[in-house]
Amino acid sequence: MSHSLQSSAVLTTVFTVEQAAEAASAGAQIVDAGDDESLVIAIRHARVDVLVCGPGSAADISRDSPLAARSGAWLLSARLLCGGLSAAEQAAGAGIARDRILVQVTPAEVGAASRAGWQVLVDVDDDAAGAAAEAAAGARASVCVWLGANVISTRHIAQIRRCLDMTESIRGSRPPAWAVRGLA
């Protein structure tokens, strides 16, 4: 069974078991728990679709891989090995299936990584706060998904999920949530 992401997904990072449950109920499909085993277990119990394990470097992959295997994670972030497309190539060369590698890029690099055939993770948040920051993150998320990003990292989960649903409906890759027809 292939685990390729069929549509865009929302990722968030959590630091407590309570945050893991809250993220799952808010609609996050992918949760980055770092290398905290208690969070890994909590996230798996929350039935989040995908778990990304380990913020580490190449030296950490032997330590993080058993954690990922014990938790049932199928998607390893290419940043485990160093980040970017070269790390993804190294991971594929080391025997990790391409459909299990998630490449973390900047918004400007989404198109190139997607065209190269990788599943793409992009962080759309910035350091600003408030409604303007949420709107900007939503706009960035929509453009990134249109260009091929599979996973969006954000702290604005519900708002970004709505933006992604709208973008996928416009693109034709998902039906609209509701259709309204009328005469103007």
What would you call each of these model-derived segments?
Residues M1-A26, S38-A184:
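Active-site-adjacent loop and "lid" segments of alpha/beta metabolic enzymes
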